[in-house]
Amino acid sequence: MQGVRITILWCIVLATIYAEEGPSTPRDDDPVIQKVRGLRNAGMKANDERMFKDAIEKLRHAISLLHNRVFGEERAAIKDPTVISQDAALYAQILNDYGSVLIRTKQYDEAIEVLEDSVAMIEKIYGDSHPSLGLSLRSLADAYMEKKAFKSAIKRYKTLRKHVKKGLGMTHEAYIEASLKIAEGYKKLNKKDTSRKVLKDTLKAQGGEINGLTIGIAELYMELSSAHVEVGEIDDALRAAETASAIFLQREGKDTMAYAFSLNALAGVKMQQKKVDEAIDLLDRAHNIAVSIYGENDRITLASAKTLQDVKDHKMNLLAAKDEL
């Protein structure tokens, strides 16, 4: 769910990049550029339809055509510096698209190589303040994360966060999402104290009045609750879990899986407090939401039913043990 929101956010950023291209120019009528854009659009459509082999083939063709214009024999025929810059920018953009498809097909090494090139080209063309740099950095960091190269992923997410901070500020959802990824990376490296510090510092950076409707804030509290539980800070975990649940309720609504997941997390804290009845009530509410959305036999619903039953069984065992005393 979080991953979907991140994707939507960066799609908006990408739309901004397209909008900056401005009005039609003679270059737009160039047959090579038209063919490249057609291949790019067809490739991304195939990607959306999970036809990855077709998507890769079309994007590789587009890259090959543009590579010849940017680096090959056709470069000598192009004299206008603006056109040269636009060609290079389009090349970097399609490299990013191609890298994203490679990530989806788990071809991480090639994805990283392609996306490193995309980042380098954008920095050379625009410097470190262009929106398209953030898009490529995010894709590159994601590729490292998927490859389980967590140190490299953290480094790139930090660069991305610095880029976002400079352009959008620390209260923007993109800054929060990058911070969540950094914290996740440290958690994967078993650096739990560092992960928790990243989460707390990000929350502190939001200032005195936190906007709970900002995407990422509820998720931030949820992760912070989990981090507190891991080190036995149960009171802090409860406060964070309650805040996350309240925000999800306000932001997503009472009949959503986001809210249901927050109830599950809150139930976990209640179990740490040995408040089993309260945990059962929360899990029952979460399960009913899942049933209303997916029905009785969905994988998610069956999992929530099992969790609920396990806790009920735990309660019965506690009662039985008490009766034996």
From Swiss-Prot:
The RxLR-dEER motif acts to carry the protein into the host cell cytoplasm through binding to cell surface phosphatidylinositol-3-phosphate. Gene3D superfamilies: Tetratricopeptide repeat domain. GO terms for cellular component: extracellular region; host cell cytoplasm; host cell nucleolus. TPR repeats lie at residues 37-75, 92-125, 134-167, 218-251, 260-293. Disulfide bonds: none annotated. SUPFAM superfamilies: TPR-like. Keywords: Host cytoplasm, Host nucleus, Repeat, Secreted, Signal, TPR repeat, Virulence. It comes from the Eukaryota. Induction: Expression is up-regulated during plant colonization, 3 days after infection. Residues 1-19 form the signal peptide. Coiled coil: none annotated. Belongs to the RxLR effector family. Secreted effector that suppresses pattern-triggered immunity (PTI) in plant host. The gene is RXLR-C07. This is Secreted RxLR effector protein RXLR-C07. It is found in: Secreted; Host cytoplasm; Host nucleus; Host nucleus, Host nucleolus. Its main location: secreted. A motif (RxLR-dEER) lies at residues 37-75.
